[in-house]
Amino acid sequence: GAGLSGTKPTPLLAARLDKGVELWEGGGRKAVIIASGGRGSDEQVSEAEAMKRYLVEERGVPSDAVMLEDRSANTMENLRNSKAIMDARSGAGAYRAAVVTSDYHVFRTAEYAHKIGLAADGVGSKTARYYWPTAFIREYVAVSNAHRWPFAVIFVLWLIPVALWFASFVL
């Protein structure tokens, strides 16, 4: 989602990674970071690989503290594949994850995590102000697509008074 610039994370993705490092350091550097993201058709490396390089080379995270999930193509796959890694690592033990994403994307990510049974807290990194309009539209479309009926009902309920108002000028 946040993409790459060549083989490096975009500023949007780097902000997510920086927030993840902040949490990791705040937690005593005990957790494992899962860098999650596949390789797009126009990308030279997977997002996960680029993320790990950034974390290790730019942020000084030990290589063995970062695991790769490099098969996913969207948010739901990121979460499912990462959950499978966490489930395998924990055995039958309970765990709680922090899912770091951009602040505009936390609601949908947390909703997906809940849907697949992933005990996780959504944590948002800051998004540049210029990107907010695009991000808002993208998330609105994604959330409304996932909840078609409630959004359709709300739209119709909104449309009725608008139609009546418009009709008052025509009649």
Predicted features and spans:
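A structural signal for short, hydrophobic/glycine-enriched beta-strand patches
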Residues: 1-138
